[in-house]
């Protein structure tokens, strides 16, 4: 399982660089613009320059509306700025067909510029609160649009977490659907160390965190702490080892 960490500034990216051995992907977002809020192109470039060259940089293009042209241009801006994972939050898509239309436009825009870039279609575990596509529709949207990964996050950051809205058995079905279509499965949404057991067991490919590695557990007011990144990775590795030998980890 890969660990994706989301700094919101160059300063935080430098903190991530200090913990580079413990993380796999540096994700650029702007939390005050939403769950998958897009940051500025120059911030993506500066963060790309700040972290080790062997660490991929991902970038969100926003909690996007159903406007395929607008979203495709935003996605191209992210990949031109140096991101190799492009994440799209299907916030304004109310049907699978709308999601597919948006994601096909993104895939074309991104892959025409950089064929090896990875495109991630993200739905929301709390979709029922905002009226967007059902979480279990996202793997099919990703597959039919030519994307590389399907993701779930939470749209409303009010202290509720991924498993509060989509229980582990439903997340496991999400992962299974993604894998059946040859996609990576990414899960996020106020994930904590306590969630790592079920996330590991269900075969999650990428886990995304911010609050769990911020001072005080606060994704907005807190700053990413290298020692918390290291601790989170250590717990991930412990669960991976114990899962590999069939021994349930004790939290």
Curated annotation (Swiss-Prot):
Belongs to the MfnB family. Coiled coil: none annotated. It is an enzyme of class 4 (lyase). Its EC number is 4.2.3.153. One of its GO terms (molecular function) is lyase activity. This is Putative (5-formylfuran-3-yl)methyl phosphate synthase. Keywords: Lyase, Schiff base. It comes from Kitasatospora aureofaciens. It catalyses: 2 D-glyceraldehyde 3-phosphate = 4-(hydroxymethyl)-2-furancarboxaldehyde phosphate + phosphate + 2 H2O. SUPFAM superfamilies: Ribulose-phoshate binding barrel. The active site is at 29 (schiff-base intermediate with substrate), 87 (proton acceptor). Catalyzes the formation of 4-(hydroxymethyl)-2-furancarboxaldehyde phosphate (4-HFC-P) from two molecules of glyceraldehyde-3-P (GA-3-P).
